[in-house]
Design a protein with these regions (language model features):
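Surface-exposed loop/turn motifs in large extracellular/passenger domains
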Residues: 1-33, 38-143, 148-176, 180-241, ...
Length: 285
């Protein structure tokens, strides 16, 4: 499928309504600039054995109060290649996604969309239940929203879980938030981040002040009230932060010493892994 639509803000790529199931199997789809694959509230999306060039794969529902919030039930990407420019998950205020499952797939940011936010998880004020990435390659960049995790100003009382297993991941946040974890000024709930048998590079975003501290994995210590737990097993992880406001020099954060501001040391477990160049072989606390 190759779309040749004349670009217009009023034109969608592929879209189905609320309470719908969208399934793409054994397909090659090329959508032009700003065309995405969308489903309405309470729907689900499955992509299997396909090659997609799209401006996001998501539920797009914006409401004005949390009581009217919409949910994407499940997004599955299996044995597929995705070149994207926007969110994979839930997009829109107060929207959420229950489950994202990525298996045997490659997801990377389209270089044409350098100004956009590519997030696996939730968009602005959006939350998620679980993100499970296995046997995959991820290479994306976002801003304000965590590239893997929750969106800007996410508010929730739920427990969320990110699991990265047997995968290669390189993610960068350009502004104010971590690359894996909780989006800028998010609050409420608990988020557990589990990395096993994987190679991960995560770069935190720019600082609002010289006293700010934004790690590659976790949360912005000065603007996020979400409880964070981190477990790393049999992996190589490089987690970076910017050294100063308006700076460009990345340094290792303090994940390897369990001294991330706002995250108690007892919430961080590392075993059989090399974290920030330091080998840590002891068992979990």
């Amino acid at each position: 499928v190759a779309s040749t639509d004349t670009p217009s803000v009023l034109t969608d790529g592929i879209r189905v309504g609320s309470n719908s199931e969208l399934v793409i199997e054994e397909s090659e789809i090329r959508l032009p600039h700003l065309r995405g694959i969308r489903v309405g509230g309470n729907g689900s999306i499955a992509v299997r054995d396909s090659d997609l060039h799209t401006y996001g794969i998501f539920m797009d529902e914006t409401v004005h109060t949390i009581t009217d919030a919409k949910t994407l039930k499940k997004l599955e990407i299996t044995d597929s290649t995705v070149l994207t420019g926007d969110i994979i998950g839930a997009r829109g205020e107060y929207s959420s996604v229950e489950e994202i499952v990525i298996r045997g797939s490659s997801i990377r940011l389209n270089d044409e969309y350098t100004y956009n936010r590519c997030t696996i998880g939730g968009g602005e004020q959006a939350s998620f239940g679980s993100i499970d990435i296995q046997d995959s390659q991820i290479d994306i960049t976002s801003s304000l929203n965590a590239p893997i995790g929750s969106g800007l100003r996410s508010s929730t009382d739920r427990e969320s879980r990110i699991r990265i297993a047997n995968s290669q991941v390189s993610v960068r946040n350009l502004k104010f938030g971590p690359a894996i974890g909780s989006g800028y000024t998010s609050h409420g709930g608990r988020m557990d981040i589990i990395i096993e048998n994987s190679t991960v590079t995560a770069k935190g975003g720019s600082l609002r002040s010289d006293s700010d501290y934004i790690p590659g994995i976790g949360k912005n210590a000065s603007g996020c009230k979400t409880v964070i737990g981190i477990q790393i097993l049999n992996s190589t992880v490089d987690s970076f932060r910017l050294e100063e406001k308006d700076g460009t020099n990345y340094v290792y954060d303090d994940l390897h010493t369990k001294e991330l501001p706002g995250i108690p040391a007892e919430n961080i477990s590392i075993c059989g892994s090399t974290v920030n160049g330091t080998r840590i072989d002891h068992t979990f606390d």
